[in-house]
Amino acid sequence: MKYEEVHPQSRAQLVEGLTSNDPEKIRSALYSASWYESDWRWTQENCLVFLGHPDPNVRWAAALSLGYIAHFHKHLDLDRVLPALHEAHADPAISSTVGDSLDMIAQNIKTQ
């Protein structure tokens, strides 16, 4: 993965990207939503859906974006997110980024 600058997108642009079936557009929408979308629950739910995507780059973006939500918004539904991330941690294609995301959550949201 190489760094890509994250740009704000409107909700309509996010929905268009997420429903595009284009892994690059989906990734871009997930990153933008996790950084800039004010409705963190909406973004969280989309990330949880895309954790199961067939493209490993999309799964990577979904996992990392959950950490970004914790970092930028200081909120997540931990009862939904933590079990999903722990399950995703078994995926060798994204296990390292799942670990990074779990670290971001632990640093930014009180988990106990």
Describe these PLM feature segments:
Residues 1-5, 27-38, 60-73, 96-108:
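Structural detector for internal amphipathic alpha-helices that build alpha-solenoid repeat scaffolds
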Residues 5-17, 38-50, 74-89, 111-112:
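Amphipathic alpha-helical scaffolding segments comprising HEAT/armadillo-like alpha-solenoid repeats
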Residues 14-27, 57, 61:
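Membrane-interacting alpha-helical segments
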Residues 21-22, 54-55, 90-95:
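Short inter-helical turns and helix N-cap capping residues of alpha-solenoid HEAT/ARM repeat scaffolds
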Residues 41-57, 61, 69-70:
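Leucine-rich repeat
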Residues 51-55, 66-67, 77, 102:
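A structural signal for the main folded, soluble domain(s) of proteins
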Residues 79, 92-99:
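Short, amphipathic alpha-helical segments
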